[in-house]
Every structure is written in C-alpha cells, then in structure tokens.
Amino acid sequence: MTSIEPTHTGKKVIVGMSGGVDSSVSAYLLMQQGYQVEGLFMKNWEEDDNNEYCAAAEDLKDAQAVCDKLGIKLHTVNFAAEYWDNVFEYFLAEYKAGRTPNPDIMCNKEIKFKAFLEFADEILDADYIAMGHYVRRRDNTDGSTQMLRGVDGNKDQSYFLYTLSHEQVARSLFPVGELEKHEVREIAKEMGLITHDKKDSTGICFIGERKFTEFLGTYLPAQPGNIETPEGEVIGTHQGLMYHTLGQRKGLGIGGMKNSNDDPWYVVDKDLERNVLIVGQGGHHPRLMSTGMTVNQLHWVDRTGPIDGCHIAVKTRYRQQDVPCTLTYTDEHTLRVVFDEPVAAVTPGQSAVFYDGEVCLGGGIIDQLIRG
C-alpha cells in the first residue's frame, strides 16, 4: 500500500471511535496524513443491567483494541443524559403524535456533532473532530465549506447529516468519504485491525436486537384500533398506529382477504382522530402516492439555502434515488415541494434532504403531503 505524505503535523483530531471498521480506518488514515490523533468512545444509552441488547461493552473493547494497535489514546465519555433529553424524548413524542421520526439524524445533530464537538473542544483541546461517515467536505476558495455526498453511492450518509452547520462541517473530517466500502475493509485488513470483518451496525442503537414493537410498547401505551380500506370497510385490527408507517407491507396480518385481488396490502394512510390504519392494495395505490409535500423546520448547511422556484433534487428517505422537484417558500421556515413525478410512501416526520449535484444543501421535516 502506498504511504500518504504527512501534511497536517501538529493538528489534533479527536476521532469518534465506535468499535466499527469505518472509524477504525478513519483514525489510521488521519495518522497517515500527519495529524495528532486520539479516539473518543461515546456511550449514549444506559442499557438495563440484565439484558444484552446493547453491544456497547463489545464495541468499547474493539475500539480499545484498534487504538492499542494504532498506538493512540482512547478516551471515553457518557452522553446518556444528553441523548435521553435531546434524542430519545423527541423519538417518543413523534411516535406519540403519529409520525415516523429518524433518531439517527437527531443523534448526529445533538450528540455526535454537538456534545461530542464541545467535549473535544473544551476537554481535549481538539483542532478537529472526525467521524467514520461516508460524506465529503469541500473547502472553497472563498472560505466557505460544503458537504458533499460520499464517493460510495450505496453508503453515502449525507442524508443523515443535513442538520450540520457550516461551522460544524468546517471543524469535521470524514476520511472514508473518499473511499468505497470495500476499500475501507481492505485497508483495515491490511493494517491488521480486528474490525476489518466486523458486521456493520444496523437499526436504532437504543433498541439493539429487540423487536421494535416490544421496545416501543414499554414506553408508549398501545392503542388498538381498526384496519380499514379507503372505502371504509373494516378488514382487521392493529395494535397501535405507532407500530406502522406509510408504505409498510409486512406485519399487517390481513393476508388472504375474500373478494380481493392478489396484490399485497400496504399502509396508505393513518386516521389519527379515529385511530384507524388505512390500507390499500398495490405499491402504487393512489392513496400511497404524493405529488408533493410541505417541509418545515428548515436547516441549510450554508445558512442561505436554495433560491425560491429552483429545480433541484430531494430524498425523502435514505438510499432513495434522487427525486427531481421544484421548491417554493411559503415563509422562511416552510417549503412547498412539487415532485416532477408522483412519489410513493412519502412519510410525515421523516426528513427531506435537498441536493444540488454532489452538494448536500440541507433539508427539513416532512409535514403535510400533497396529493392529486
């Protein structure tokens, strides 16, 4: 492997060490570039004493092994209180209101690039922080900093980082954003890092291996109700609207209906007032399709945002293909977005993230759907 010429001697970087391969290789690459590197392992969730759902202890062990191998110091910090107040309570409130939140986005906003950055600044005297996210940073000649999609289109994580400010991006390094995932694993293997073949973490960190319904039910009381067709026919019951999201197909328990065609059933709407789950047949059922949406709680990485009436791309969920759309501001906090073509399963509570080519501009929270 070719060595990288050190260019940043003396600059101190605190790497968020998760115990995974991406942060492991990030630390190695930054060392190769001449940075003074130290690791910081975050504990964001206080798991029950008698369960083994959370792999925090195993992850810490792996992070320590990698830091030992690289010869760098590993610090630990507990952000469980901040996580509960700023991420988990938001998660519960959104589900209670019938929406489908994305706690990973809130975790990045409140913990990884706020609490972590403040700790790295105030306690560890860092020049930069670094994370193993698949995004890129571009420093422009006018002094501005932009966030770009990761080189690996299948792993690009800019969708989860749209709430970062220009200042946060300028203080953050993303070494693996320039690489494909297979290259990251190859580097880890070549360097003898034990995380080289570690499985990627998936799902929500505080739920771990538990069933989602089981976990949510311990915090929010279930409210069973009817499942209806768009025509109002009752065809089953649900255990709680919070357990279902638009476009969901599995776990409805209504297969084999009489007088229905062979198309699978999908969640096409929720009637919160009546506590009714509305389902229709076919992945392109008219009630599942939206011609646009309103988006609020806007955040733009460079503070200014795209101009009114512009035609750009949006993602309404992770790994979705870019959706061409036109933006109109209804006020400074709300956008009306019209898609070029109807889109299925746009979900209130999820994030809409906007792009101009490679550049992640920012985004907001999907509020209302526009149909027809």
UniProtKB/Swiss-Prot annotation:
<feature type="binding site">
    <location>
        <position position="42"/>
    </location>
    <ligand>
        <name>ATP</name>
    </ligand>
</feature>
<dbReference type="InterPro" id="IPR014729">
    <property type="entry name" value="Rossmann-like_a/b/a_fold"/>
</dbReference>
<dbReference type="InterPro" id="IPR046885">
    <property type="entry name" value="MnmA-like_C"/>
</dbReference>
<comment type="function">
    <text>Catalyzes the 2-thiolation of uridine at the wobble position (U34) of tRNA, leading to the formation of s(2)U34.</text>
</comment>
<protein>
    <recommendedName>
        <fullName>tRNA-specific 2-thiouridylase MnmA</fullName>
        <ecNumber>2.8.1.13</ecNumber>
    </recommendedName>
</protein>
<dbReference type="GO" id="GO:0002143">
    <property type="term" value="P:tRNA wobble position uridine thiolation"/>
</dbReference>
<keyword id="KW-0067">ATP-binding</keyword>
<feature type="region of interest" description="Interaction with tRNA">
    <location>
        <begin position="155"/>
        <end position="157"/>
    </location>
</feature>
<keyword id="KW-0820">tRNA-binding</keyword>
<feature type="active site" description="Cysteine persulfide intermediate">
    <location>
        <position position="205"/>
    </location>
</feature>
<dbReference type="Pfam" id="PF03054">
    <property type="entry name" value="tRNA_Me_trans"/>
</dbReference>
<keyword id="KW-0808">Transferase</keyword>
<dbReference type="GO" id="GO:0005737">
    <property type="term" value="C:cytoplasm"/>
</dbReference>
<dbReference type="Pfam" id="PF20258">
    <property type="entry name" value="tRNA_Me_trans_C"/>
</dbReference>
<dbReference type="GO" id="GO:0103016">
    <property type="term" value="F:tRNA-uridine 2-sulfurtransferase activity"/>
</dbReference>
<dbReference type="InterPro" id="IPR046884">
    <property type="entry name" value="MnmA-like_central"/>
</dbReference>
<dbReference type="GO" id="GO:0000049">
    <property type="term" value="F:tRNA binding"/>
</dbReference>
<keyword id="KW-1015">Disulfide bond</keyword>
<keyword id="KW-0547">Nucleotide-binding</keyword>
<feature type="binding site">
    <location>
        <position position="132"/>
    </location>
    <ligand>
        <name>ATP</name>
    </ligand>
</feature>
<feature type="active site" description="Nucleophile">
    <location>
        <position position="107"/>
    </location>
</feature>
<comment type="similarity">
    <text>Belongs to the MnmA/TRMU family.</text>
</comment>
<dbReference type="InterPro" id="IPR023382">
    <property type="entry name" value="MnmA-like_central_sf"/>
</dbReference>
<keyword id="KW-0819">tRNA processing</keyword>
<dbReference type="InterPro" id="IPR004506">
    <property type="entry name" value="MnmA-like"/>
</dbReference>
<feature type="disulfide bond" description="Alternate">
    <location>
        <begin position="107"/>
        <end position="205"/>
    </location>
</feature>
<feature type="site" description="Interaction with tRNA">
    <location>
        <position position="133"/>
    </location>
</feature>
<feature type="region of interest" description="Interaction with tRNA">
    <location>
        <begin position="317"/>
        <end position="318"/>
    </location>
</feature>
<dbReference type="Pfam" id="PF20259">
    <property type="entry name" value="tRNA_Me_trans_M"/>
</dbReference>
<keyword id="KW-0694">RNA-binding</keyword>
<feature type="site" description="Interaction with tRNA">
    <location>
        <position position="350"/>
    </location>
</feature>
<dbReference type="GO" id="GO:0005524">
    <property type="term" value="F:ATP binding"/>
</dbReference>
<feature type="binding site">
    <location>
        <begin position="16"/>
        <end position="23"/>
    </location>
    <ligand>
        <name>ATP</name>
    </ligand>
</feature>
<feature type="region of interest" description="Interaction with target base in tRNA">
    <location>
        <begin position="102"/>
        <end position="104"/>
    </location>
</feature>
<keyword id="KW-0963">Cytoplasm</keyword>
